[in-house]
Amino acid sequence: MQVTETLNEGLKREIKVVVPAGDLEAKLAERLETARGRARINGFRPGKVPTAHLRKMYGKSFMAEIVNEILNDLSRSILAERNEKSATQPEVIMSEDEKEAEKVLDGKADFVFSLNYEVLPAIEVKDFSKIAVTREVVDISDEEVDEQVKRIASSTRTFETKKGKAENEDRVTIDYLGKLDGEPFEGGADNDAQLVLGSGQFIPGFEEQLIGLKAGDEKVITVTFPAEYGAAHLAGKEATFDIKVKEVAKPNELVLDDETAKKLGIESLERLRQVVREQIESQYGQVTRQKVKRQILDALDGDYQFETPQKLVDAEFNNIWQQINFDLQQAGRTFEDEETTEEAAREEYRKLAERRVRLGLVLSEIGEKAGVEVTEEELQRAVYDQVRRYPDQEKEIYDFLRRTPDAVANLRAPIFEEKVVDHLLANINVTDKKVSKEELTAEDEDAASEAKPAKKAAAKKKAAPKKKAEEGKSEEA
């Protein structure tokens, strides 16, 4: 067998392999001899089937198996002998000449093929102990906890029908029909919708115009959808809503006690406060970690500059680009609406893909050198979390994960990355800084999540006047 390197440029490699016909023939002879003892063919005693007859019956199928085994085994062994790691599965290039392929299967021609691949770059882990990051910390006040407890407990609040005019904090039950230029628009109507005035549930200007109405009243109100509204065909547009008030109800006093907590499934008010505080701490902690992680990645980005495997970059870019176009389509927007062009966006996200790949390789090398591993328990927990996202499809998801090693690898990767970040945090300079919750959560274009750094168009929502339809703000790296 001849193995010849025919390309060595940067990370690109091409290896030409020639397996002599004689070697193939020898492997085939071994396989035919093994088959002779097992074959049961009419007219022949066991173990007495002539080799020529076996070759006629099984020769090509056996040779095809031999060729596939050679491809699988040599791809691994060649990389191991060269002490190289392929960034992706090596591409096998063979002759497309059918006559040539027939000769190989008949044992009359050498088996010639090439392996094309990109090697993972050699990365020397640098001293990261001098990396310095600021960890923003928020002190959670009792007032904030109580405010959140009250907000949660308000779902247990009861209302009592009243005859007077609707006031702030009253609950109104209404039918509404939204119109643009006098024509009803999709998703702009609802019956028996319940709205607590002053809750901010609907878009600005809607709730205020219902104050003072009584049950049985009808009114046409005019509102303007926010410019950043999720449904692009409504964003910034003036619309009218035909309103019919069916009931006005006043809120009963909200009592915060153990009974209220029990209605929420918590044993006591004190335990409810504790749960709420833990939730707030977790929410702020996630934001803090993302900001710290971004600082670490930015520092590593400045320390490591090297050529990245283009196939990995291509795959990452395609994932990003597919998501970007899906988001734009869902929102009914274009690149021009985002104040850019497709060409400029491609360039931006190509750079982003290259950064992601490079940092991924750096984190992988740091983790490997540090002995970071993902335990089976951690992986099983990730599998369980994944399955929980698809209720009533548990069996299908489990079967898919069993059949698809890459899917399991995709679950393992983020766990590994977070453990590497933990390792870095334990070995770099971290300075805590007390900030307000407003400072912590303030939008920062350069501090968006590295896991999802692509700027996303707002998702299309039901075209109702509900304020929550505005959600889906953009993110960018």
UniProtKB/Swiss-Prot annotation:
Q: Which GO terms describe its biological process?
A: 'de novo' cotranslational protein folding; cell division; chaperone-mediated protein folding; protein transport; protein unfolding
Give the GO molecular function terms. peptidyl-prolyl cis-trans isomerase activity; protein folding chaperone; ribosome binding
One GO cellular component from the entry?
A: cytoplasm
What this protein catalyses is: [protein]-peptidylproline (omega=180) = [protein]-peptidylproline (omega=0)
Q: What is its EC number?
A: 5.2.1.8
Q: Which cysteines are joined by disulfide bonds?
A: none
Keywords for this protein? Cell cycle, Cell division, Chaperone, Cytoplasm, Isomerase, Rotamase
Q: Where do Basic residues bias regions lie?
A: 454-466
Question: What range does the record give for the signal peptide?
Answer: none
- What family does this chain come from, according to its entry? Belongs to the FKBP-type PPIase family. Tig subfamily.
Task: Please state what the annotation says regarding this protein's domains.
Answer: Consists of 3 domains; the N-terminus binds the ribosome, the middle domain has PPIase activity, while the C-terminus has intrinsic chaperone activity on its own.
PANTHER family from the UniProt entry: TRIGGER FACTOR CHAPERONE AND PEPTIDYL-PROLYL CIS/TRANS ISOMERASE, TRIGGER FACTOR-LIKE PROTEIN TIG, CHLOROPLASTIC
What is the purpose of this protein?
Involved in protein export. Acts as a chaperone by maintaining the newly synthesized protein in an open conformation. Functions as a peptidyl-prolyl cis-trans isomerase.
Q: What is this protein called?
A: Trigger factor
